Curated annotation (Swiss-Prot):
Keywords: Riboflavin biosynthesis, Transferase. It is an enzyme of class 2 (transferase). Gene3D superfamilies: Lumazine/riboflavin synthase (3.40.50.960). Pathway: Cofactor biosynthesis; riboflavin biosynthesis; riboflavin from 2-hydroxy-3-oxobutyl phosphate and 5-amino-6-(D-ribitylamino)uracil: step 1/2. (2S)-2-hydroxy-3-oxobutyl phosphate binds at residues 87-88, 129. HAMAP family: Lumazine_synth. Its EC number is 2.5.1.78. It comes from Paraburkholderia xenovorans (strain LB400). 5-amino-6-(D-ribitylamino)uracil binds at residues 24, 58-60, 82-84, 115. This is 6,7-dimethyl-8-ribityllumazine synthase. The active site is at 90 (proton donor).
Amino acid sequence: MEIGQYQPNLDGDGLRIGIVQARFNEPVCNGLADSCIEELERLGVTGEDVLLVTVPGALEIPLALQKLAESAQFDALIALGAVIRGETYHFELVSNESGAGITRIGLDFGIPVANAVLTTENDEQAVARMTEKGRDAARVAVEMANLAVALEQLGGDDDEEEDEEEEA
C-alpha cells in the first residue's frame, strides 16, 4: 500500500521567526542564541525576518512568547534558556513550569514553538550542549513552520465555503 508522506522542509526563505532568550545563565544563553541565529541564516531566514527579545529568566519566557504569538507576525517561535541545577528545589519548579508554559503557547495559539531551554546538572553540561541545541532549535522552528503551512493547506477551501455559508 502506498501512503502519502510529507518530506521535512528546511527552507527558511520568507519565514518570520521570533526568539525569546532568557538572560539568566547569560553566557550559555548567548551561545544558544548565536548558534540558533547562525543556523537560521544558513537555512535562508534573513535577519530582517528575525526578532530577538530577552527576558530575565526561564519563567518569563512563556509570557514573552504569548505576546509574540498574539501579534500574529511570526511563523514560528523559539525559546532559549538554561536552567542549571542548584542545591534547592527551585530547579524542578523552573524547569517544569517554564516547559509547560512554552508548550501551552504553541498549542493555544497554533504556532510552532521550538523549546531550547536547557535543563542540566551543571555548567559544563550546559556549555557542552549550547551550540548543538541552538542549531537544533533553528531547524525545528523552520521545519515545523513549513509543516504547519502544509497541514493547513490540507483543509483546502473549506474555510472559504464555511464563510460563504455563514454570510448567506
